[in-house]
Amino acid sequence: MSERKALLILHGKQALNEEVRAAVEARRAAGWDLQVRLTWEAGDAQRLVQEALAAGHTRLIAGGGDGTLRDIAEALANADAPASLVLLPLGTANDFARAAGVPLTPAAALDLLDVPARAIDLGEVGGQMFLNMATGGFGSQVTANTSEDLKKVLGGAAYLFTGLSRFAELSAAYGELQGPGFHWHGELLALGIGNGRQAGGGHELCPGALADDGLLDISILPAPQELVGTLKNLLAGGLGIDNLFVRARLPWVEIKASRGLDINLDGEPLQGDTLRFTARPGALRVHLPEDSPLLGGAR
């Protein structure tokens, strides 16, 4: 029975979540030795992962939103330990979990403890890893939030313009992207670099992405000067934004932007004028549904 042992690292704000408590108790009643630890401040996720591994745990559970899942996934991948991860999505967007088919109810999510773990990729940039997606654009107020007005205009692609509170704030700048067999340069509005498929609560920016193919999906929204001025009218007239994207699938891509690029890395901000994004194949073992849409690249 020693293998029926796991440790849940739970975001502190979820400590009083009765659904989580009931799911944990149900697992314990089924014979699992399931311990719980709470995060309180920055750095706790990494510390708790290290403590869990030192104590001999080989199954960890990440309970929280996309940022918490990223922190725990990164810490576990960096530890290079023979341990696997179960995702307990408790955020508002839960983008990676939704795309992967992970149940959003705690009891059903914990059922994945009984499903064999599969190796999946992570993305890496500037020494930081991401589980789901990096989105970026130009603007001084890039955050994880997106204007409701902008969502109405741009639909799913609005999340690319994270934090731009008014359409008038959209700005294009020159960027250059280069990877194996791929070179693109020009004025761009925004981009998405996905290990997963969606961001912003269900918007598929990288619709064909697989989490186990050793590649990152790149989606670029170009901004020729004539398009920047008329984008709102084009979209309001019924032109779908998806066919405006330039897409690629690469093991790595280097981005150069003279004005600097604001990146949202699974909720974490990052900025730079030269950034290299790399796929880390098989960096993490995760218990996903056997029919997960994100699996298939390594089959």
Curated annotation (Swiss-Prot):
GO CC annotation: cytoplasm; plasma membrane
Chief localization: cytoplasm
PROSITE patterns documented for this protein: DAGK
GO biological process, alphabetically ordered: phospholipid biosynthetic process
Residue sites binding Mg(2+) per the record: 210, 213, 215
Compartments it resides in: Cytoplasm
InterPro entries assigned: ATP-NAD_kinase_N (IPR017438), Diacylglycerol/lipid_kinase (IPR005218), Diacylglycerol_kinase_cat_dom (IPR001206), Lip_kinase_YegS (IPR022433), Lipid_Phosphate_FormReg (IPR050187), NAD/diacylglycerol_kinase_sf (IPR016064), YegS/DAGK_C (IPR045540)
Needed co-factor(s): Mg(2+); Ca(2+)
A molecular-function term among this protein's GO annotations: magnesium ion binding
Cited Pfam families: DAGK_cat (PF00781), YegS_C (PF19279)
Annotated disulfide bonds: none
Cofactor info, note text: Binds 1 Mg(2+) ion per subunit. Ca(2+) may be able to substitute.
Domain DAGKc: 1-129
Catalytic residues identified in the record: 268 (proton acceptor)
Keywords, sorted A to Z: ATP-binding, Cytoplasm, Kinase, Lipid biosynthesis, Lipid metabolism, Magnesium, Metal-binding, Nucleotide-binding, Phospholipid biosynthesis, Phospholipid metabolism, Transferase
Binding site for ATP: 39, 65-71, 92
Enzyme nomenclature, EC number: 2.7.1.-
UniProt-listed HAMAP family: YegS
Family assignment from sequence similarity: Belongs to the diacylglycerol/lipid kinase family. YegS lipid kinase subfamily.
Function recorded in the entry: Probably phosphorylates lipids; the in vivo substrate is unknown.
Name of the featured protein: Probable lipid kinase YegS-like
Provenance organism: Pseudomonas fluorescens (strain ATCC BAA-477 / NRRL B-23932 / Pf-5)
